[in-house]
Amino acid sequence: GCPVPSNPQRIVGGSATTIDRWPQMAALLYTFNWNAYWHYCGGTILNNRSILTAAHCPANDPPTRWRIRVGSTMSNSGGVVHNIANIINHANYNSATQDNDISILHTATPIEFTNNVVAAAIAGTNYNLGDNQVVWATGWGATFQSGWNVEQLREVQIWTINQQICIERYATLRAVTDNMLCSGWLDVGGRDQCQGDSGGPLYHNNVVVGVCSWGRGCAQAYYPGVNVRVSRYTAWIQSNA
C-alpha cells in the first residue's frame, strides 16, 4: 500500500534500478523547516510543466512546501530541481475515503527533456487492463527520517488484482471504488509499494495506469496495494496539465 510516509521503508521485494529505465519518474521533495527539502512522495512527468501525483501528498500545503527532482536515480541529489508554482488537487478528493486521490503540480520553470527526463504515456479513457496483468511500480520510498542517506530508485514487478476480490478484502476497512485499481502479489505478498512511494506510477507496458494511493500495511499477502485508476481521470489530467 501507499500510506502517508511514517517510517522509512521503500518498494518492497523489488530491486535497485536507474532513472534511464524509468525517465518519467519525479521525486517530490518536501520541507519541514523551509530550508532543506527531502524526498517524501513520487510523481510522474506529464509534460514540460506538470507532474502527476496523489492528492494526499500535497493535501492542503502551499506550493512552496514542495519541489520536484527529475532526471536523477537518487532522490536527494543529482538531476534538476524545480520549484512548484501551483497545486491542483482533484475537486472531489476525499481524505477520509481516499477517493479521487489525484493531483497535478505545476512547475515554476519548464522541465527540459533529456534521455533521463521524459513525459509519460498515460492510460486513455478506454484503456483495457485485465486481471493478473504484469505491472511495475517504481519509487524511492524513503522519508525525511532516512533522507540523510542517498536513496536509489527501486522497481518491483507485481500484478493487477481482480476488483471484486479487492473490494472483498478491504470490505471491513474502506470502500474500494471504481476509481481505484488494486495491485500486488495476492496471497503471496512480499512485493508492493510502501511509505514514500505514494503518488508514484504503476506501469503496464510502459503506460501509466495507476498512481500509488493507499493500502493496509505493505506487501501483505491478504491486502493488495491500491492505486488511483488513471483511465478514469484521463480527461481531468489532460485539462489540468
Language-model segments: residues:
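Acidic glycine-/aspartate-rich tracts in secreted/extracellular proteins
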Residues: 31-34, 56-61, 71-76, 108-113, ...
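Small disulfide-bonded, cysteine-rich extracellular recognition modules and tandem repeats
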Residues: 5, 14, 29, 60-61, ...
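Secreted/processed peptides and extracellular or luminal domains of membrane proteins
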Residues: 2-8, 63, 172, 188, ...
